[in-house]
């Protein structure tokens, strides 16, 4: 971070109480807002995950106001794990807070692994409510475990980034889903990368940067 960048811890009001969050932004007025959702809470996923912080930093450096937060039951956030359903409510509460702080700015919505399911569900709800995100960015979506087929409209472009050597999410399942889903995502395959993109975070950040509102 530069001296002009800001990072602040904040408490949001979620459906089950407090949501622990971090807001980052660069110098000046943000040109877009972003939210990045973290991986599975029951397997150590938090807003401090490296994929999450990499995407957040990319948004901040591009001039966005980016929010990452702990889902219910994680860290200091109140509540208990809810299989992606309650976590979607958490996301919508975070989006409402962010859009109130910077009304009218386009929203870049992202999620990693479990967080991509939450982000996709949230994107559909926002679209149904007439407030679609500008872009939905899904990293390693666990299509083998969660019902992504029920998410058939987000009213925004979708990018899917999938590592070819993913040891958690079967890559071929993601590739097949990406071809069949009506979301018609832009599929980016990352070779020589595992689920957590160890040693491959820079290529991930480069893809994300090319999909931010100012780059489209």
Regions inferred by a protein language model and the residue ranges of each:
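Short beta-strand/loop motif that positions the catalytic acidic residue
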Residues: 154, 159-162, 166
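Acidic catalytic loop of the alpha/beta-hydrolase fold
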Residues: 164-169, 195
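N-terminal cap/lid segment of alpha/beta-hydrolase-fold proteins
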Residues: 1-29
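Short, surface-exposed "cap/lid" segments of acyl-processing enzymes
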Residues: 27-68
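Catalytic histidine-centered segment of alpha/beta-hydrolase-like enzymes
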Residues: 193-205
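Alpha/beta-hydrolase active-site loop
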Residues: 81-101
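Gly/Ala-rich beta-loop-alpha elbow adjacent to hydrolase catalytic centers
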Residues: 110-119
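Short alpha-helix in the alpha/beta-hydrolase fold that links the catalytic acid
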Residues: 156, 170-179
């Amino acid at each position: 971070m530069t001296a002009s960048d800001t990072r602040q811890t904040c408490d949001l009001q979620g459906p089950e109480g407090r949501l622990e969050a971090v807001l980052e932004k660069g110098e000046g007025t943000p040109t877009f807002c972003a939210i990045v959702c973290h991986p599975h809470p029951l397997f150590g996923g938090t807003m401090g995950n490296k994929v999450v912080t990499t995407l957040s930093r990319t948004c901040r450096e591009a001039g966005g106001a980016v929010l990452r937060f702990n889902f219910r039951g994680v860290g200091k956030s109140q509540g208990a794990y809810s299989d992606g359903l309650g976590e979607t409510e958490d996301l919508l509460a975070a989006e409402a807070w962010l859009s109130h702080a910077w009304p009218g700015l386009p929203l870049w919505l992202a999620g990693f692994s479990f967080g991509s399911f939450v982000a996709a569900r949230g994107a559909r709800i926002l679209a149904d409510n007439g407030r679609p995100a500008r872009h939905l960015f899904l990293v390693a979506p666990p299509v083998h475990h969660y019902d992504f087929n029920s998410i058939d409209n987000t009213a925004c472009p979708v990018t899917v980034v999938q590592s070819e050597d993913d040891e958690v999410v079967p890559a071929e399942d993601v590739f097949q889903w990406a071809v069949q889903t009506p979301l018609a995502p832009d599929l980016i395959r990352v070779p020589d990368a595992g689920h957590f993109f160890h040693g491959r975070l820079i290529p991930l950040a480069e893809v994300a940067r090319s999909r931010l509102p100012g780059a489209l």
